[in-house]
A protein has these predicted regions:
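Short beta->alpha connector loops at strand-helix junctions that form conserved
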Residues: 107, 126-130, 205
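N-terminal "arm"/small-domain region of PLP-dependent enzymes with the aminotransferase-like
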Residues: 1-55, 143
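Glycine/small-residue-rich loop that forms an oxyanion/phosphate-binding "nest" at active or ligand-binding sites
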Residues: 84-97, 161, 179-183, 187-188, ...
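Active-site phosphate-binding strand-loop segment of PLP-dependent enzymes
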Residues: 125, 130-185
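PLP-dependent aminotransferase class I/II
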Residues: 200-273
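Conserved PLP-anchoring active-site segment centered on the Schiff-base-forming lysine
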Residues: 95-116
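Short, conserved active-site loop motifs that form the nucleotide-linked donor/cofactor pocket
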Residues: 79, 175, 200-201
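Phosphate-binding glycine-rich loop
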Residues: 62-102
């Protein structure tokens, strides 16, 4: 099979965390939420009309997008959703990182970034953290084809201040800067506050951590309308039906239960402290 692309031959795939079949295990390998989903999610699932599963889901995920719009105070046209934030991020790599210049991300960070870069033939550069495992904003003032980093970073757990994020964004106006906020609800401010003045900023979040829905695979991106329209265009070019109907309804229900979300997130923060 010599026709296989070289980048596919050499790619080293991300290794997902094991899901043990035995009970009574304290499982820490994938940072799953120890608390169950919101009771409102359980109610939606228990009362789901299974006859609707014969139909394809809403490709626009309207119920979920509209609830995200209310929750975060943004226009629905500023929202893109996918099958977990990994799906959203992979679509971002395909859509925005198309330059012959390297994409920049920390050398100690989420290990999927270089996997996607290798798979999609995207040049990249791992930027070293400083001696205290912090991201040095000055290191991102160089020629690049895009920037991505988690905030807080994983696995260090160290977060950048919003002023530092804005410094990176403003210094790279010709590049898309993606802030991966998988753990943002456990200890730092969201870069969503910076969207109004920064059209090259994209913020990605997930329902897997703070909303206890890792098993349903729901992620989303929020950014300026033009960037979001490009994400939908790429997505609909190869798979128009991503989120299933149950995930869309359950995700919307989780967003409506703000009290439960805040309580469980604070419980986890207090446990860590």
């Amino acid at each position: 099979m010599s026709s296989w692309k070289d980048n596919v031959r050499k790619v080293e795939p991300y290794v997902p965390g094991e899901q043990p079949k035995i009970k009574n295990v304290i499982k820490l390998n994938t940072n799953e939420n120890p608390y169950p989903p919101s009771p409102k999610v359980e109610e939606i699932i228990k009362n789901a009309d299974c006859s609707l599963l014969r139909k394809y889901p809403d490709p626009a995920c309207s119920e979920l997008v509209n609830e995200l719009s209310k929750t975060y105070g943004v226009d629905p046209d500023m929202i893109f959703v996918g099958v977990g934030s990994d799906d959203v991020l992979a679509t971002c790599f395909m859509t925005f990182f198309c330059s012959d210049k390297p994409v920049l991300f920390p050398d100690v960070t989420y290990s999927f970034y270089d996997v996607w870069a290798e798979l999609f033939n995207i040049p990249y550069e791992r930027v070293p953290l400083d001696g205290d495992f912090n991201i040095n904003t000055a290191d991102y003032r160089k020629e690049n084809g895009g920037i991505i980093f988690p905030n807080p970073n994983a696995p260090t757990g160290i977060a950048l201040e919003l002023s530092d994020i804005e410094e990176i964004v403003k210094a790279n106006k010709e590049s898309v800067v993606i802030v991966d906020e998988a753990y943002v609800d456990f200890g730092t401010r969201s870069a969503l506050e910076l969207l109004d003045k920064n059209e090259n900023l994209l913020v990605v979040q997930t329902f897997s951590k703070s909303r206890s829905l890792a098993g349903l695979r729901i992620g989303f991106a929020i950014g300026h309308k033009e960037m979001i329209s490009y994400l939908w265009a790429v997505r609909n070019s190869f798979n128009s039906y991503t989120l299933n109907s149950l995930a869309t309804a359950a995700g919307a229900a989780a967003l409506r239960d703000k009290e439960y979300f805040e309580k469980t997130a604070n419980d986890i923060i207090n446990t860590r402290e």
